[in-house]
């Protein structure tokens, strides 16, 4: 059975960025696991106006576990870091933990944020770079194992994907006032369209994505804003950048075609 490992920062990241893709690949027989670095205790409180950060973290953990069941995610691991403080970690701490988790899971694909963190969130960006470092070590380890057994199986090397928002989509959503033009003190630009290597059609899985998002009751404001445009053709797709295939960095060439699968 093939495996995908998602690595994100907060509960709901999995549903906003990859819910349709997860549902699609689970239906195709893949196992999907998720690592969440924090419990999102500094997020919106929504209906839970009296919740302390600790209580909100408990609520959001349960919301994520419920969403994971809707999507068919097999295992959810929380790393227990504090929301909003990932960039303050000593270099190597998060990276080493993620490497051990990736090595334990032995995934065919690892998916995390792109280098913009999609929304410029510092936690997202930290998770992106930490996961990339961990994946590089993992890919080298896999390469060593394949060499030891004399395997020449083409395509056996794992892949690292960045989930992203295309620059064109970000501009469109800003024009509609669906997202702000600035986020975390910087323009919300998204990733250059020319960097995107895979566009997954998730139109058949919009209802599953909706149900997963609706599990995140505490984040009702963001969920409602997203779902208000959920039937738009641009949001019937999820977008990815293939960053590494094994130990090889991947760049989109001018003659390369965008794939419709991971």
Segments from the language model and where they lie:
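Metal-dependent de-N-acetylase/amidase catalytic core
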Residues: 2-3, 91-262
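Active-site rim/loop-helix segments in enzyme catalytic domains that contact anionic ligands
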Residues: 1-105, 133, 137-140, 247-251
